[in-house]
Every structure is written in C-alpha cells, then in structure tokens.
C-alpha cells in the first residue's frame, strides 16, 4: 500500500493547519495530527491553501489553439465574426488534429488544478468530426480528468441544415448534454423553437442541458426566460444550465429582478465567462461601454448557482487563455465588482 502524508495544510472551515493522509491515491484521513509509520512519505505544504480540484464548466476543446489558423483571424473581435471564421475554416479538421490540440489544452488545465471539464463539441458538421474526437478523448483521459460533452450546434439548430438532427445524433453517440444557441438563429421564432427542442431532447434522452443563451448586448434577447419557464414545467431546472446570458447585463432592472424569482424557483444554473465576454461584448458601444457579463453578483446574492469558466484557449473568439481558472476568477470578481466591502 502506497501511503503519503501532507502536513501543514490550510483547509477551508478549519482554524488550525491540518494533516492529510493519502493511501493508494485516495484521501483517507484529515486531522491536526496523524500517526504514520516511519517510512511513510511526508510532504510539508507550508500553510498553503489546499482545495478540491477545480471544475471548468464551459470550454470548447475542439476550438483550442486555432486562433492562428489560416483564415481564422477575427478582425472585429465579435462573437458573430468568430462564428463566421470558424465556419469558413473548420472543414479540413481531422479527428487526430482535434485530439492533439485538445490534449494540449487539457494538460494545461490539469496543471492548473482542474480535474472536471465540460466541453462543447460543434455538431454543425455532417461528419460530426469534433464530437467523435472528443468522445475518444474523454475515454482515453478518463483516469486523469472527468470530461462531459455538450452536443452543441455552433451554427444554429435551425439556421444550419438538419442542425436539430445532428444535435440528436450527438446525444445518441454519447454526448452528455444538449446544447443550443438561440440568439444566433436567423430569427426569434427559430431561437424559441430551438429552446423547445433542447428541452424535448433532454427529457427524451434523460440528458443535461447547457445552452449558449443570450450571448448578446441586445436587451431584447431574452431566451433565458423561455428556458427557465420550460425547466420549471418539466422539473429539470437543476439539470439545466444557461451559459453567458450577457443580455441580462443590458436589460432594465425591473425585468432582471423579476426574473431572479423564476431563476431561483427553477434551480437553473448559470455560467459566466468573464475574460471571454468582456473581450467580445460591447463592440458596438462607444461610451459608456458595457462590460458584457451577466449579473453575476445579483445571481450570487439571490442564492442562484453561478460560476466562472475559461470558454476559449486561443481560438477565433478569444486570442488568449491558458486554462488557469485562478486568472478567470481574478478577472471575474473584478469585472463583476464582487470585492466591495
């Protein structure tokens, strides 16, 4: 049996430094003092904060390290040009090439303490190349990192030919979550139809939901309202996530705070991508210029589950990113003004 003891660990909820005993890679005991055999390996943490592994709940592993790809440059720095550039350059991607880039990104995240990743896989591709690559990666790395995969229609569920069918096929192949992008659909009716379809598929296949929702400065982009209502009706709010919801930062306060009640009732989860959205949003603004984030502080203060994520690592949407969630957190709590006394 392999034993290892860590001493002088600073743990949340403990006033004193603690010792941690690990046996065969499993945490066995936490106490102020643990007696072990003389040959047990001991590592002194020197009073450093010791935390569980991080979760990156929103990233696109099929996109990573493509920012310098021929034709992928996003000159306007907007969400919509990013999608256009991706659409124009993704046709020559292969399973092996996607996996090689994704493994590099996963290693970066793991080196920064991440052990759980939810990645979106673009299924607006008749060959489903990205999904196949990430399903293989998930299995190959299962002993290192836990990966969830979202069947995600980057170019729209109804604005891309057979997008809804491709999302469903992705679920049949093994994707864990149903994705959508209602604000990118050609019209509001298509966006609403896509939300209904997302919920229908989630119920049919007993899958989680994670929708790119209202990633826009447009205060009339309010698809999260429909997603919330349907999650309440179906009783699946805790299994449902709304990612981005940037437009909540642009709507008037009376609407936002009315919605807080429904968000709370539904149990809906929210993901904000602070480094990504402060970069992408507000591009049509002069001044004042919006920060582009959802109402992180208000969601948190209302007891609604909200978290931060990396989203991109050097792709057509965001030229930076290194998988360090502490950098994302640092930016998030500053941009969302969550450090006020």
Indicate residue ranges for each PLM-predicted region.
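N-terminal metal-binding scaffold of metallo-dependent hydrolase/deaminase domains
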Residues: 1-37
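Histidine/acidic residue-rich metal-binding segments in metalloenzymes
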Residues: 129-141, 160-269, 286-308
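Divalent metal-coordination and catalytic microenvironments
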Residues: 9, 25, 47, 58, ...
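Active-site gating loops and adjacent loop-to-helix segments of metal-dependent hydrolytic enzymes
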Residues: 65-98, 174-177, 223-241, 266-269, ...
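Alpha-helical scaffold segments that flank or form the walls of functional sites
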Residues: 50, 67-120, 128-140, 165-172
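Active-site mouth loops of central-metabolism enzymes
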Residues: 85-100, 150-161, 182-189
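His/Asp/Glu-enriched, well-ordered alpha-helical/loop segment
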Residues: 10, 208, 229-240, 276-280, ...
């Amino acid at each position: 049996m392999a034993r290892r003891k860590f001493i002088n660990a600073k743990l949340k909820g403990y006033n004193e430094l603690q010792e941690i005993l690990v046996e065969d890679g499993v945490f066995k005991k936490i106490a102020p003092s643990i007696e072990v055999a003389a040959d047990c390996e001991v590592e002194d943490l020197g009073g450093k904060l010791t935390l569980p592994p991080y979760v990156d709940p929103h990233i696109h592993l099929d996109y990573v390290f493509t920012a310098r790809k021929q034709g992928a440059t996003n000159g306007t720095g907007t969400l919509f040009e990013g999608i256009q550039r991706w659409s124009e350059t993704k046709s020559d991607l292969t399973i092996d090439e996607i996996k090689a880039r994704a493994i590099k990104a996963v290693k970066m995240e793991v080196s920064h303490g991440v052990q759980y990743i939810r990645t979106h896989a673009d299924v607006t591709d008749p060959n489903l190349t990205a999904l196949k690559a990430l399903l293989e990666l998930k299995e190959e790395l299962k002993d290192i990192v836990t990966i969830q995969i979202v069947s995600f229609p980057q170019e729209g569920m109804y604005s891309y030919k057979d997008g809804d069918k491709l999302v469903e096929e992705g679920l049949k192949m093994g994707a864990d979550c149903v994705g959508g992008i209602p604000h990118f659909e050609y019209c509001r009716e298509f966006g609403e139809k896509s939300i209904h379809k997302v919920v229908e598929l989630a119920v049919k296949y007993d899958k989680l939901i994670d929708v790119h929702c209202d990633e826009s400065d447009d205060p009339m982009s309010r698809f999260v309202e429909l997603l919330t209502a349907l999650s309440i009706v179906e009783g699946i709010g805790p299994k449902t996530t709304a990612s981005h919801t940037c437009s909540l930062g642009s709507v008037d306060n009376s609407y936002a705070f009315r919605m807080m009640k429904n968000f709370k009732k539904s149990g809906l989860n929210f993901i904000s991508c602070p480094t990504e959205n402060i970069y992408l949003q507000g591009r049509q603004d002069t001044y004042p210029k919006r920060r582009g984030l959802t109402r992180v502080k208000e969601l948190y203060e209302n007891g609604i589950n909200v978290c931060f994520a990396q989203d991109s690592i050097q792709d057509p949407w965001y030229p930076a990113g290194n998988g360090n969630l502490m950098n994302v957190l640092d930016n998030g709590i500053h941009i969302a003004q969550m450090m006020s006394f």
